[in-house]
C-alpha cells in the first residue's frame, strides 16, 4: 500500500510536466498513426488479397520434330539447339544441354506443353548421316523412338506497360534447397519474426559501424517484398517507416507460405534492356536456359546471391564478382547444414554455367511477328496478350528463318552496287501444309520498319505465267504440254486508244511452239496468245479465287501486270506446291494458357484438291524451267538433285526481280527491287533466283519427285497439233499428259515413216531449246 501511495504521489507531481507530451502522443496515435495504419492496412489487403502479377505472353517457334529420314544437317541441328537456348556442356545430362560425339548428338530436352499436347523432358540420341536423321533413340534404354520433339525456341514476348519478365510458380514446386538457402542467406529467422527482425537490425547496425560502411542488411524477406510491391527506391525515414509498418501488417494477415510464394515470384533478379527479370523461375531461364526445378545447387546459390545486387553481381558482366558471391552463399549453405562441406567444396569448383544467349527475346523476327499478330488479334485483345501469361506456338522454323536472312544478305553483297541499292523480301512455307516457316521483310535482319514481305505490292512479271498455263491445262481435252501456241508478234488497242505491242525479253519470236517451251523459256508472246485464246476473264477469275482484288482484266495481266506482295505471291504458288489444295497461309498453331491447356487451336481445313492433273503438269513443266529454262542455274549451282520446280519473274525495265520455287518440303518466294521503284538492274534469274539458291544450299529439305504425278502418263506428242505421236516422228516430244485424254492411235506418223524410206524425211525429234532466256 505504501508503494502504491508513493507511486500515486509521484504521478501527481509529474503530471503537470508530462501532461502536454502525453496528450501530444495520444493525439498523434489517434489522429495520425491509427488512421494512417488503417490506410496502409487497406492498401496491403487490397493488393495481397488479389495478388496478380503481370506476366507477358511468350511467342515460340515450332517444336523441332526429329524422326528417322527427316532431312537434317549438323549445322542446322546445332543452330536449332543454340537458338532454343541449349548449351553444349560436354555431358548432355541436365535438361537444356547437349553433347556431340562424331555424328551423334545426346540431347537432354526440357519438355513443353503445346497445342499438340507437348512432350515430357527426356534424353535422346540423334544420329545424323547423308543429310538426314539416321536414327532417334532413348538415351537411357537405347530403344528406337518413332518421333521426338525438342521444345521450341522463344522468338518474341508481348510485354505490358511494366515490361516485366516473370513466370509464376507455386510454393510446392520450388526446390526445397532454394527455399532453405534463401532463408539461410537473407532471413534466418523468417519462420519466427513478425515482419521485422529487431535482432537482425541490431546485428547489422553493429557490423556496419565496425566496417565504416554498409556491409550487412537487416531487412527481412517480408520487408524486401514490401519494397518490391509497394515502395520506390528512395532512401528516407518515411519509406523506412512505411516498410516496417506494412511488413507487420502483412505478417498479421497472411501466413508465411503465402508471403514466401509472393517473394519467390516477385524478387528482382536482373535486367535486359527495358525488360526486368522478376522471380526465380524467370531468372532460371534467363541465366541458365532451363526451368527452376532443373537447377543445380550451385546455380541456386548464384541466384540467391544475386538478390543482394542483381546488377552488381550480374554474371554476364561481372563473372568474377558473381563467382565470389556464389561461393560465399555456398559457404552459408554448409554453415546452416543444407549441404555438406564436401558438397560445398565440389560445387565451388564448378564454373558459373551461364548461357550466353539469355532467353528474353522481345521481337527477334519482326516481319514474321507482324503476320502472327494479324492472325491472333481477332481472338485476343491487347490486354490479354500483354499480361495474360499465354504461350503462342507459331510455325516459325528457326533454321529456315536464319538461312533466308543469310541468303538475302549474301546475295545483296555479291551484287555490288546493284545489291546496295536494292531491297529484298522472302517468304518460306511448308509445301504440303501452308505453314509459314520464315518471313524476311528487309535485307537488314531484324529491321522493324517497312515489311516488304507483307506490305510491298509490286508487279510480279512472269511469275503469273504458270497460272495462265494451269488454266489452259485444266481443259485436257483441248490443251496439253505439247499443244502448239503462237510465239508471234501481236498488237492490241488499249482502252485509252494507244497500241500495246508486247515483246519477248530478247526481242525475237519463235513462231509456233509447244506449250512446254513457252513456259520453260518464259516467252511473253506465246503466253499472251495462249491467254487470249483462253480468255483474259477466265484468268482474272482464277486469280481472284485466291483472294486477290483489283485484278486488271487487260491482256497485260497475262505477263504479270499485277501488283502483289511476296506473301500474296506465295499464296498463289502454295496452291501448286500443295498439289492443287488451296491452303491458307498460317503462322500460328495454337495458344496455351498458364496451366498448359490449349485455349485456341488454328487448324487448316483442307478439302479435295482442284485441277490436280493440271497442277501436276505445271509442276513438271516448272521442273524443266529449273533444268533447261530461265532457272537452269539451279542445276549448275549443285542443287540439281532437288528436282525443284520454279519460275522466275521480272517486271518492266527490270524494276522487280522475283523467283518462286519449291522442293518436296519447302516453297520459297524471293523478291528484290528498289524502294523508289527505279530499275534495279536485276532479272529474276540474276537476283532473286540467286538468293533462293543460297537458301537451299543450307536448308535441309527433301527433293521433289522427278516422276510425273498420279493421274499422268508419259506420251509421245506431235508438237504441231498436240496429238499422240510415236518415238522418232518429226516434232515428237515425250511429255506427261493427263491419262486417258489422248487417242491411243498415233496420227500421221505412218506416212512420215513412208517418206523416210524414200529418203524424204530424216528429221530427228525436235528437242526443247536449251538456251535459257534471262527472265
Model regions: which residues?
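Juxtamembrane regions of bacterial inner-membrane/periplasmic proteins
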Residues: 2-417, 435-437, 488, 493, ...
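Active-site loop and adjoining helix of the penicillin-binding protein/serine DD-peptidase-beta-lactamase fold
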Residues: 165-171, 247, 251, 307-325, ...
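Solvent-exposed loop/turn segments at secondary-structure junctions
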Residues: 188-190, 208, 231-232, 266-270, ...
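Short, well-structured active-site flanking segments
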Residues: 191-201, 277-278, 340-343, 450, ...
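Conserved catalytic neighborhood of penicillin-recognizing serine enzymes
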Residues: 207-235, 290-293, 360-364, 478-539, ...
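Glycine-rich, acidic and aromatic/proline-enriched surface loops and short helix-turn segments
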Residues: 224-231, 265-269, 289, 293, ...
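Beta-strand segments within the central parallel beta-sheet cores of soluble alpha/beta enzyme folds
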Residues: 261, 265, 346-348, 483-490, ...
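A penicillin-recognizing enzyme superfamily signal
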Residues: 394-417, 426-430, 439, 445-450, ...
Amino acid at each position: 500500500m505504501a508503494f502504491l501511495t508513493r507511486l500515486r504521489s509521484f504521478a501527481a507531481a509529474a503530471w503537470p510536466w508530462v501532461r502536454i507530451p502525453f496528450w501530444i502522443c495520444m493525439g498523434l496515435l489517434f489522429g495520425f498513426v491509427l488512421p494512417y495504419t488503417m490506410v496502409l492496412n487497406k492498401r496491403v489487403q487490397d493488393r495481397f488479397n488479389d495478388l496478380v502479377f503481370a506476366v507477358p505472353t511468350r511467342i515460340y517457334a515450332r517444336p523441332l520434330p526429329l524422326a528417322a529420314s527427316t532431312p537434317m544437317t549438323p549445322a542446322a541441328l546445332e543452330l536449332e539447339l543454340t537458338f532454343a537456348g541449349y548449351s553444349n556442356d560436354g555431358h548432355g545430362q541436365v535438361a537444356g544441354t547437349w553433347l556431340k560425339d562424331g555424328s551423334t548428338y545426346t540431347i537432354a530436352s526440357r519438355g513443353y506443353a503445346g497445342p499438340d499436347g507437348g512432350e515430357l523432358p527426356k534424353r535422346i540420341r540423334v544420329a545424323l548421316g547423308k543429310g538426314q536423321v539416321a536414327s532417334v533413340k532413348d538415351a537411357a534404354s537405347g530403344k528406337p523412338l518413332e518421333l521426338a520433339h525438342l521444345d521450341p525456341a522463344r522468338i518474341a514476348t508481348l510485354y505490358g506497360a511494366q515490361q516485366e519478365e516473370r513466370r509464376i510458380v507455386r510454393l510446392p514446386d520450388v526446390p526445397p534447397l532454394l527455399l532453405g538457402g534463401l532463408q539461410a542467406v537473407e532471413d534466418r529467422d523468417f519462420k519466427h519474426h513478425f515482419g521485422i527482425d529487431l535482432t537482425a537490425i541490431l546485428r547489422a547496425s553493429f557490423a556496419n559501424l565496425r566496417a565504416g560502411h554498409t556491409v550487412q542488411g537487416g531487412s527481412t524477406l517480408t520487408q524486401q517484398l514490401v519494397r518490391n510491391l509497394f515502395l520506390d527506391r528512395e532512401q528516407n525515414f518515411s519509406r523506412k517507416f512505411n516498410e516496417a509498418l506494412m511488413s507487420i501488417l502483412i505478417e498479421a494477415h497472411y501466413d508465411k507460405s503465402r508471403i514466401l510464394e509472393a517473394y519467390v515470384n516477385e524478387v528482382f533478379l536482373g535486367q535486359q534492356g527495358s525488360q526486368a527479370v522478376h522471380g526465380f523461375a524467370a531468372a532460371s531461364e534467363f541465366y541458365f536456359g532451363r526451368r527452376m526445378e532443373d537447377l543445380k545447387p550451385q546455380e541456386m546459390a548464384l541466384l540467391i546471391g544475386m538478390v543482394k545486387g542483381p546488377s552488381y553481381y550480374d554474371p554476364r558482366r561481372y563473372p568474377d564478382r558473381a563467382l565470389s558471391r556464389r561461393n560465399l552463399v555456398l559457404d552459408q549453405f554448409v554453415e546452416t547444414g543444407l549441404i555438406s562441406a564436401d558438397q560445398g567444396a565440389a560445387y565451388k569448383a564448378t564454373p558459373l554455367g551461364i548461357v550466353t544467349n539469355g532467353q528474353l527475346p522481345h521481337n527477334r523476327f519482326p516481319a514474321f511477328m507482324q503476320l502472327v499478330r494479324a492472325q491472333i488479334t481477332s481472338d485476343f485483345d491487347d490486354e490479354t496478350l500483354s499480361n495474360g501469361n499465354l504461350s503462342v506456338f507459331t510455325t516459325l522454323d528457326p533454321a529456315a528463318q536464319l538461312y533466308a536472312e543469310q541468303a538475302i544478305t549474301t546475295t545483296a553483297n555479291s551484287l555490288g552496287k546493284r545489291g546496295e541499292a536494292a531491297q529484298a523480301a522472302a517468304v518460306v512455307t511448308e509445301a504440303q501444309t501452308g505453314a509459314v516457316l520464315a518471313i524476311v521483310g528487309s535485307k537488314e535482319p531484324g529491321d522493324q520498319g517497312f515489311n516488304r514481305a507483307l506490305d510491298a505490292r509490286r508487279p510480279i512479271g512472269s511469275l503469273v505465267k504458270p497460272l495462265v498455263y494451269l488454266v489452259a491445262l485444266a481443259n485436257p481435252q483441248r490443251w496439253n504440254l505439247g499443244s502448239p501456241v503462237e510465239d508471234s508478234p501481236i498488237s492490241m488497242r488499249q482502252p485509252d486508244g494507244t497500241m500495246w505491242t508486247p515483246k519477248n525479253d530478247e526481242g525475237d519470236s519463235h513462231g509456233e511452239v509447244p506449250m512446254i517451251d513457252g513456259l520453260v523459256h518464259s516467252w511473253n508472246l506465246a503466253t499472251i496468245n495462249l491467254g487470249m485464246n483462253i480468255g483474259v476473264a477466265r484468268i482474272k477469275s482464277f486469280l481472284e479465287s485466291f483472294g486477290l482484288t483489283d485484278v486488271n482484266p487487260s491482256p497485260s495481266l497475262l505477263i504479270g501486270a499485277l501488283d502483289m506482295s511476296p506473301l500474296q505471291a506465295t499464296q498463289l504458288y502454295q496452291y501448286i506446291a500443295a498439289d492443287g489444295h488451296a491452303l491458307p497461309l498460317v503462322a500460328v498453331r495454337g495458344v496455351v494458357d498458364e496451366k498448359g491447356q490449349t485455349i485456341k487451336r488454328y487448324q487448316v481445313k483442307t478439302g479435295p484438291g482442284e485441277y490436280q492433273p493440271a497442277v501436276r503438269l505445271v509442276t513438271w513443266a516448272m521442273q524443266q524451267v529449273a533444268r533447261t529454262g530461265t532457272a537452269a542455274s539451279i542445276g549448275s549451282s549443285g542443287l540439281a538433285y532437288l528436282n525443284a520446280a520454279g519460275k522466275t519473274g521480272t517486271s518492266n525495265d527490270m524494276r522487280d526481280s522475283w523467283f518462286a520455287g519449291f522442293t518436296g518440303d519447302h516453297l520459297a518466294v524471293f523478291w528484290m527491287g528498289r524502294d523508289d521503284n527505279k530499275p534495279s538492274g536485276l532479272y529474276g534469274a540474276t537476283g532473286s533466283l540467286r538468293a533462293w539458291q543460297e537458301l537451299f544450299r543450307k536448308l535441309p529439305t527433301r527433293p521433289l519427285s522427278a516422276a510425273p504425278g498420279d493421274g499422268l502418263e508419259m506420251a509421245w506428242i506431235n508438237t504441231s497439233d498436240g496429238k499422240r505421236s510415236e518415238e522418232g516422228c518429226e516434232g515428237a516430244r515425250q511429255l506427261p499428259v493427263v491419262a486417258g485424254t489422248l487417242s491411243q492411235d498415233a496420227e500421221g506418223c505412218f506416212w512420215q515413216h513412208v517418206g523416210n524410206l524414200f529418203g524424204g524425211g530424216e528429221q530427228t525429234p525436235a528437242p526443247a531449246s536449251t538456251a535459257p532466256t534471262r527472265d
